[in-house]
Amino acid sequence: MSIISQLSKSLPKNIVISGEENTRPFECDGLSVYKQKPLAVVLPNKLSQVKKVLEICRKNNTPIVTRGAGTGLSGGAMPIKDSVVLGLSKLTKVISINPQEQTAIVEPGVRNLAISEAADEYGLYYAPDPSSQIACTIGGNVAENAGGVHCLKYGLTVHNIESIKIMNIEGEELVFSRQDEGLGLLALMTGSEGLLGIITEITVKLTKKPEVAKLVMAGFDSVRDCANAVADIIKNGIIPAGLEMMDEFAIEASEEFARPGYPLGSKALLLCELDGSDELVSNDLETVLSLLSKASSVRVSESEEERLLLWKGRKSAFPAVGRISPDYYCMDGTIPKRHLGDVLEKINALSKHYSLRVANVFHAGDGNLHPLILYDAGVPGELEKTEEFGNEILKLCIDVGGSITGEHGVGVEKLDAMCYQYSDSELDVFHQIKAAFDPQSLLNPGKAVPSLHRCAELGNMHVHHGNLPHPELERF
């Protein structure tokens, strides 16, 4: 009996999707340049159904790719050949909210923004706010360790969860908590991209809404002056709720798309949000304004509506750029903040070298870059040129002491770059961790951690007499 027949026989027929046309919507995630149709898609609405899918796939040695809302930007939820996609988007219960403890227990398919909506009546909200928060799920956020424009002060997903439940490949439920002694397994699972287990329940930390929030918008005549302002704000002990930069191209695209009132003609834009008590915000605002002497324009939000509108422009940057070009490639690297100006200048030089336009938006407070490379996949060779450009940006991040990913994950997009960032001994550890949780390598295989052979082919791993190191390790 085929695996599709087994799934259809063991589960409600309305949650099993098969057939080439029916599975097409699941052939990629937000990184649509890479596509692969799965054997089948299962959309369980009960945890018992998740367990049954794992059981059937394990017995048939069939790979499982877990999917949330499909908003990821690294190909982490892209199916692999002959795989089953396990979509968790129907597991949408907000199980409980504890306003005293400031926590909420939710299923993995709950949307990021829906948590804040559910907690609003208690004066609480969920702080991490990726640009896709209206659609992305908390399970996907945990899998990628998502951040957002407010991560500088309030942290990434890993800083805002108390515990998670996962189901391993054997169907066994495991619980990882911030209170656990010993190894930080909660942190290990956060950002594991579906390689180690299926996230089935999350206890998130809720944050009290600030008394006051003000957003300062400053335009600059040079990117370097804007980057220097970022450094000055941090050096003066200010911890903004959000600290974002955009270059001229991103400013123009966002203004055309969302009409937030950005200063057209500026070479760079700084958005600095200050929140807390009225006294704290007033004092911090005075300090920040004194540090913006080189800004060509400065505006401070006067209402909540204005603050949200100014943020809307930044959060609309990706779709705004998407309207300008047939395709765009969104990068995600991190660098030390002191290198912001230099790195942006080098990215612009690479843009000229490859004859591809770039819009730069990034979380300036923690050095998380999001260059958007514009290209046309219909032009022969342009995708390959774009990928090469993207890899050069990631190498640049590594060269200045940064990382190849800040919040989008590795997925399939950055597998080659992993070979540049990590040594063979470090990849050895990654493979051993994967094998400890998933001995058959059925959970999202081929993602996040490159095979040793792949790195050897790239010339970043020594091969002695034709033999790869660590022959005892799995090759996937």
Model-predicted segments: where are they?
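N-terminal flexible segment immediately upstream of the FAD-binding catalytic core
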Residues: 1-55, 72-102, 131, 206, ...
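FAD-binding subdomain of flavoenzyme oxidoreductases
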Residues: 93-246, 443, 460-476
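C-terminal substrate-recognition/cap domain of FAD-linked oxidoreductases
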Residues: 17-27, 204, 208, 214-222, ...
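Intrinsic disorder at enzyme termini
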Residues: 423-476
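Alpha-helix capping/hinge segments and adjacent helical runs
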Residues: 12-13, 398-410, 435, 439-446
